[in-house]
């Protein structure tokens, strides 16, 4: 009989480092999405959900997923959380699947390129309804790390 605790990767000292580097890879690929959007002729309107949906269109496209080695990931919009909705859920699938609660979150907010104080408006929203939601456990964090996207708008 095999001892299941030996096969549990969570006991491995570098398991958190592996998860963090995996998420770093995902976020680096999101930078490639940004460049693809910039280089496309697609019109981007000043609306958080619309911008997020353009990102998701790339992240859910099979050709893009093959090119950037994202086939083992499922990207979902508007994931219901403890007390709100996070913009993008990244669920590892296939070999990396743990369970439906084991996912990364990406919260998206617009940032104002003109009002840089962050005391009111969009920049305050980024802090209050973005960063603070992660810091206060408003959003779950199975892997201990999540991300914020700031869409700079005029």
Which residues make up each language-model segment?
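Glycine-rich, often proline-containing surface loops adjacent to acidic residues and nearby aromatics
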Residues: 28-36, 104-107, 145-149
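Acidic-basic catalytic patches of nuclease active cores, encompassing PD-(D/E)XK
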Residues: 17-76
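Active-site metal-binding core of divalent-cation-utilizing nuclease and nuclease-like domains
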Residues: 69-104
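Short, well-ordered amphipathic alpha-helices
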Residues: 55-60, 88-92, 135
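Nuclease-adjacent, charged terminal/linker segments that flank catalytic cores
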Residues: 1-17
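Catalytic cores of nucleic-acid endonucleases
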Residues: 108-154
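Short, well-structured alpha-helical interface segments that form or flank functional binding sites
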Residues: 46, 50, 54, 83, ...
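Secondary-structure boundary elements
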Residues: 61-65, 95-98, 139-143
């Amino acid at each position: 009989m095999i001892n299941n605790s030996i096969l549990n990767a969570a006991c491995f000292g570098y398991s958190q480092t592996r998860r963090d580097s995996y998420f770093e890879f995902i976020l680096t690929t999101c930078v490639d999405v940004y460049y693809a959007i910039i280089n496309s002729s697609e019109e981007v309107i000043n609306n958080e959900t619309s911008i997020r949906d353009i990102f998701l269109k790339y992240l859910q496209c099979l050709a893009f997923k093959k090119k950037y080695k994202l086939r083992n990931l499922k990207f979902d919009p508007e994931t219901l959380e403890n007390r709100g909705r996070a913009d993008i859920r990244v669920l590892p699938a296939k070999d990396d699947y743990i369970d439906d609660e084991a996912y990364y979150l990406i919260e998206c907010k617009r940032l104002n390129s003109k009002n840089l104080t962050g005391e009111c408006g969009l920049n305050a929203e980024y802090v209050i309804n973005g960063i603070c939601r992660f810091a206060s456990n408003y959003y779950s964090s199975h892997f201990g790390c999540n991300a914020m996207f700031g869409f700079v708008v005029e």
